[in-house]
Regions:
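A short secondary-structure junction signal
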Residues: 141, 156-159, 228-231
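Eukaryotic short linear interaction motifs
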Residues: 136, 153-156, 225-227
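Short, solvent-exposed loop/turn segments that connect beta-strands within catalytic domains
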Residues: 134-141
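Nuclease-adjacent, charged terminal/linker segments that flank catalytic cores
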Residues: 1-117, 284-315
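Non-catalytic C-terminal interaction segments of nucleic acid-processing enzymes
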Residues: 1-35, 168-315
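Short acidic loop-to-beta-strand element that houses the catalytic metal-binding Asp/Glu
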Residues: 112-114, 120-131, 143-149
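Short beta-strand-loop-alpha-helix junction that forms the active-site gateway
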Residues: 148-169, 186
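A general structural motif
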Residues: 141-142, 213
Length: 315
């Protein structure tokens, strides 16, 4: 295992040296939300693995949190306004998914929306997105479940913590030290996608069964997009339905390397995209594995302690 490096620290990219990054104070404001403090002790927003971005903070890509505690009455919840950053992200998603001509006033969202499931489990959509009239003459669904998964957890997280503590305590600290490779740490795409699969099946079904049938959009980071594509690329021919009646979209959120390198957050963009049929994609997901005759034949242990060799044909 090679390692990872810190890409963003409390909203500041680490790969530029124009502005010296200093250790964050407890309760510093989150740079990606309005009126919210950073909840992390070590405020790393994203890391790089083999040069590709992996988001490790739930608020970095586009937080769906809709309320905040009243500072004067903690039992009371106040509506949390969307930040300018969140609005830009959501507008870009809408432009790619519906029409490139949309403006802020055309797009409407609901956040943390409860969804019904047969097993009584609690599910909620990150966002429900539609146009302000609730319907559209454009191709694709009128309304969609919108899910955000820019990354997830890492292995050996303690190594990242130790690196950040050593950097913070170093009186000669620099951005270069902050972005040094942290060995023996990796991203865990398998866990990130495994956690999302149940959500994917339930929320996608809810969207398709509602009214005349809606759709679902997954915004995922570059490494997760790579992982999902490897799972299904040889399992099915997925129709490209961007200009037709798509019910599922995968949008890759990646670093916009064409933008100038200036202090602040890393600029993001929508890279690869897949607009297709939800049911066809589900079939590709479950159509994993191949016939494994050797697994069902050969030497078996009998319960009396002896062994028996069973042939493939059962005789």
């Amino acid at each position: 295992m090679a390692g990872v490096s810190v890409a963003e620290y409390l909203g500041q990219r680490t790969d530029v040296d124009d502005l010296q990054i200093n250790p964050a104070v407890v309760g510093a404001p989150c740079p990606f939300m309005d009126g919210r403090k950073c909840h992390k002790k070590i405020p790393v927003c994203s890391i790089r693995n083999k040069g590709k971005l992996w988001i490790v903070c739930e608020n970095r890509l586009c937080s769906s949190k809709k309320t905040i505690s009243d500072p004067f009455n903690p039992r009371r919840k106040l509506k949390l306004p969307l930040s300018s950053y969140q609005k830009k992200v959501l507008l870009e998603i809408a432009r790619v998914s519906f029409s490139p001509h949309l403006q802020f006033e055309h797009v409407a969202v609901k956040r943390e929306v409860p969804l019904k499931a047969n097993d009584q489990s609690d599910y909620s959509a990150d966002f429900i997105m539609t146009l302000f009239e609730g319907k559209t003459a454009l191709s694709g669904p009128d309304r969609v479940v919108l899910e955000m998964q820019g990354g997830g957890e890492t292995s050996n997280t303690g190594e990242i913590t130790r690196h950040l503590i050593a950097w913070a305590e170093n009186p000669q600290r620099t951005n270069e030290i902050l972005r040094q490779e942290i060995p023996k740490v990796g991203t865990i795409e398998t866990n990130a996608w495994r956690r999302q699969q149940e959500q994917f099946f339930v929320k996608g079904n809810v969207a398709l069964m509602t009214w005349k049938g809606y759709g679902i959009i997954f915004c995922v980071g570059e490494l997760l997009y790579d992982y999902i594509w490897r799972k299904i690329e040889n399992k099915a021919v997925l129709p490209t339905l961007e200009e037709h009646n798509w019910t599922l979209a995968f949008l890759e959120i990646c670093e916009d390397e064409e933008q100038p390198s200036t202090p602040g957050p890393l600029p993001l963009k929508i890279g690869r995209r897949l607009f297709t049929n939800y049911q066809t994609f589900v079939h590709a997901l479950i159509n994993q594995g191949e016939p494994s005759l050797d697994a069902f034949a050969g030497e078996f242990d009998r319960l009396d302690g002896s062994t028996v060799n069973i042939q493939r044909d059962g005789y």
